[in-house]
Structure formats: structure tokens, C-alpha cells
Curated annotation (Swiss-Prot):
It catalyses: a quinone + NADH + 5 H(+)(in) = a quinol + NAD(+) + 4 H(+)(out). It comes from Neisseria meningitidis serogroup A / serotype 4A (strain DSM 15465 / Z2491). PROSITE patterns: COMPLEX1_49K. NDH-1 shuttles electrons from NADH, via FMN and iron-sulfur (Fe-S) centers, to quinones in the respiratory chain. The immediate electron acceptor for the enzyme in this species is believed to be ubiquinone. Couples the redox reaction to proton translocation (for every two electrons transferred, four hydrogen ions are translocated across the cytoplasmic membrane), and thus conserves the redox energy in a proton gradient. This is NADH-quinone oxidoreductase subunit D. NDH-1 is composed of 14 different subunits. Subunits NuoB, C, D, E, F, and G constitute the peripheral sector of the complex. The keyword Chloroplast does not apply. It is found in: Cell inner membrane.
Length: 418
């Protein structure tokens, strides 16, 4: 009886350091060439959609931060926009500028993590160290406005939790920092938050150039990314790819331009688009997107400096009154009590609201039955569609290229598994 040749099957993850969380993939190999890549998901499923249906609209907000835990505030933004659309809430213009500014800060945070970890997985260690240096400063912005460095819960239906602070947290002296280092670290933290943001926007483009020096013309980086994971424009659209995964294939689609929300229609920025649809082009798109985000942040900062005003709606059925008013007015106290015990009542209806998330189109679909909780909440996670393309993108490549493809998809399992 003749022996039958069989392909070799291996498990990739979920413990693998390049699996970006808890991805388990069953790879079928012919030698070292991939015949089939089968992603198994669900290991980080926490029932977010169902949990949100048991909470009031305000209580459900912090769950959004924990979906894509690298792009926290953009998740919040999509949810808040959906609730505002259903309830017909008018958001003050200053709050819209603050939201857009922090959405772009979040985009830079995401791309630094994406590029840094992608390079690290492939074998270039320096990039992630540079990326985390800049991420540290941006996370200080999160901390200054919300008190948290990751799960901010800063956006609210109707605006934002509070206005921008007049100061930035400073480094304190320790046995690891001498007086000279401490002075350098705190130099840009002497003024307001907007001063800190402007100083960051001045020096960050040079830091992007440094990252590019490490990778863009690096021979090994190009060998590992050029021609790997190619997706044609037609196939990208058929697969439901969005964000950099779609733009890297040459399709100019960005929700901020095609269906503008908040104040994006007042912003001057460009959409970087790839040509070849491979890992290298997607990397270049992310690099350029960070530069465009800096442009948007500068425009927001400029506007916020000269336009004071309210940062949350004055309709107390949806947002709490100021604490000073609450301590003197009985009606304000009642509004506060009702809002945090019973929650806001959103009129009957349904809506799908999408934002341009750093990873693609992040959508929130809400059905309201007029109660204080969503009747149904559905989340459209961009990474879910991208991961489905894994088999097609990896087929015919070598085992080592799987790591490059996972990195270019920029997968985070909080949103994929929900």
C-alpha cells in the first residue's frame, strides 16, 4: 500500500508573541509554504454587545474603551455619535473640536503601536522603543484630561467630560533622574495642555523621520514587506476591508472625507493612498497618516485657543449640571440624581453611525425602544473583516511571512472578539 503524502499542520498561537493577543491560527504547510491559514477567534470574547444592553446608555460607554484597547477614544466617539443621533442632542462646537483633536491623538497612538510592533515582530527592535517614547507623551494627554492613561471614558453623549486643563502633569525627582534630566523632561510641561500639544506637534514630525530612517529604505525591512500580503483594490472592496487595508490597495476611501462628521469638513488634510496593496505600502500609508494627524491637531489647537465655550450639552436630560449649580439648585440636583440612577431615555428608533477608526471603519448600530438602555447594540469592528482575509493574503507565502501579514493587518482582539 503506497504511502500518502500529507501536508504538515501546525498551531500558530495563541501563546505566540506575534499573535497580537489571543489569535490561534491553524496553518497547513507544504514544506515551508502556506497552503491554508485558518484563524480561530473567540478567545477574548467578553459579550460586550449583550453587556451593553443590560446597562444604561452612560454605563455602556466604558465598555467601548475596552474593545480596541489601543484606540480607546475613537471607540467612544462612534458610540457617542450614535446616541446623539438617536436622541437628537446638539453637541457644542468646542466639544467637537476637542473630540476631533483627541481622535487624531488616538490615531497617532495606534499607528505608533502598529508600526512599532510590526517591526518588532519582523526583527527590528529599535522602532518599538522610539514609538513608545512618543506614545508616553500622548498618554500623558489622556491622563491630564481623564485621569486614566488608557481607558479614558472622556467622551460623553453630548460632548466631553470636562474642558482642557490649564496644566500638564510633571515628572517628579527620583533616584533615576537627576536635576538636569528632570528639567529637560518638564520643559514642555510648564504651560497649558495646548502649549504641550503645540510643542509635541513641532518635534514629532522629526521623530517620524527618524522612524522612517530606520525602516523605509532598510533592505531587510523591504525584503520582508514588499510583495507580501498583496490585496487588489477589487478584492479589498469585496472582502469589506476599510481604513489602511483598503487605502493601501489604492482605493481613496476615508469616512472623514467621504461622510464627514464632527468638524472634519473644516479640516485641511490629505488621504495617503498606496499603489501595490502590499505590507510595505500599508506601512507607508500609516507613516503619512501620522503626519496628517499632526496637521489636524494643529488646526484644532489653534481654534481652541481663541474660542472658549461650553464642552457639553446644556440639556440636563442627557448631561449632568455643573457641580456649583447642583449645590444651590434643587432642580439641578434632581436632574443629576435621575441621570445617574435611571439614566437617559433615548427616543425609539435605530441608527448606524460609522467613524474613521485608525484600523478602518468602526460602526455602532443601536436600536432604541424608548427605554433607558439600548434594545440592541451591534458593533462593526474593522479588524474582524481584515482577519477573514488572512487565508487569501497568506496563501503561497512562507511561514515567516505570516507574522508580517498579522502585523500589517494591525489586529487587536478586543474588537475582533468583542
Amino acid at each position: 500500500m503506497a504511502n500518502k503524502l500529507r501536508n504538515y499542520t501546525i498551531n500558530f498561537g495563541p501563546q505566540h508573541p506575534a499573535a497580537h493577543g489571543v489569535l490561534r491560527m491553524i496553518l497547513e504547510l507544504d514544506g515551508e509554504q502556506i497552503v491554508r491559514a485558518d484563524p480561530h477567534i473567540g478567545l477574548l470574547h467578553r459579550g460586550t454587545e449583550k453587556l451593553a444592553e443590560t446597562k444604561t446608555y452612560l454605563q455602556a460607554l466604558p465598555y467601548m474603551d475596552r474593545l480596541d484597547y489601543v484606540s480607546m477614544m475613537v471607540n467612544e466617539q462612534a458610540y457617542c455619535l450614535a446616541v446623539e443621533k438617536l436622541a437628537g442632542i446638539d453637541v457644542p462646537i468646542r466639544a467637537q473640536y476637542i473630540r476631533v483633536m483627541f481622535a487624531e491623538v488616538t490615531r497617532i497612538l495606534n499607528h505608533l503601536m502598529g508600526i512599532g510592533s510590526h517591526a518588532f515582530d519582523i526583527g527590528a527592535m529599535t522602532a518599538i522603543l522610539y514609538a513608545f517614547r512618543d506614545r508616553e507623551e500622548l498618554m500623558d494627554l489622556y491622563e491630564a484630561v481623564s485621569g486614566a492613561r488608557m481607558h479614558a471614558a472622556y467622551f460623553r453623549p453630548g460632548g466631553v467630560y470636562r474642558d482642557l486643563p490649564d496644566f500638564m502633569p510633571k515628572y517628579e525627582s527620583s533616584k533615576f533622574r537627576n536635576a538636569k534630566v528632570l528639567k529637560q523632561l518638564n520643559e514642555s510641561r510648564e504651560g497649558t495642555m495646548l502649549d504641550f500639544i503645540d510643542a509635541f506637534c513641532e518635534r514629532f514630525p522629526k521623530n517620524i523621520d527618524t522612524l522612517e530612517t530606520l525602516l523605509t529604505d532598510n533592505r531587510i525591512w523591504k525584503q520582508r514587506t514588499v510583495g507580501i500580503g498583496v490585496v487588489s483594490p477589487e478584492r479589498a472592496m469585496q472582502k469589506g476591508f476599510t481604513g489602511v487595508m483598503l487605502r493601501g490597495s489604492g482605493v481613496e476611501w476615508d469616512v472623514r472625507k467621504t461622510q464627514p462628521y464632527e468638524v472634519y469638513d473644516k479640516m485641511d488634510f490629505d488621504i495617503p493612498v498606496g499603489v501595490n496593496g502590499d505590507c510595505y505600502d500599508r506601512y507607508l500609508c500609516r507613516m503619512e497618516e501620522m503626519r496628517q494627524s499632526v496637521r489636524i491637531i494643529k488646526q484644532c489647537s489653534e481654534w481652541l485657543r481663541v474660542n472658549p465655550g461650553p464642552v457639553i450639552t446644556t440639556n440636563h436630560k442627557f448631561a449632568p449640571p455643573k457641580r456649583t449649580e447642583m449645590k444651590t439648585g434643587m432642580e439641578d440636583l434632581i436632574h443629576h440624581f435621575k441621570l445617574f440612577t435611571e439614566g437617559m431615555h433615548v427616543p425609539e428608533g435605530e441608527t448606524y453611525t460609522a467613524v474613521e477608526h485608525p484600523k478602518g471603519e468602526f460602526g455602532v448600530y443601536i436600536i432604541s425602544d424608548g427605554a433607558n438602555k439600548p434594545y440592541r447594540l451591534k458593533i462593526r469592528a474593522p479588524g474582524f473583516a481584515h482577519l477573514q482575509g488572512m487565508d487569501e493574503m497568506a496563501k503561497g507565502h512562507m511561514l515567516a511571512d505570516v507574522v508580517a501579514i498579522i502585523g500589517t493587518q494591525d489586529i487587536v482582539f478586543g474588537e475582533v472578539d468583542r
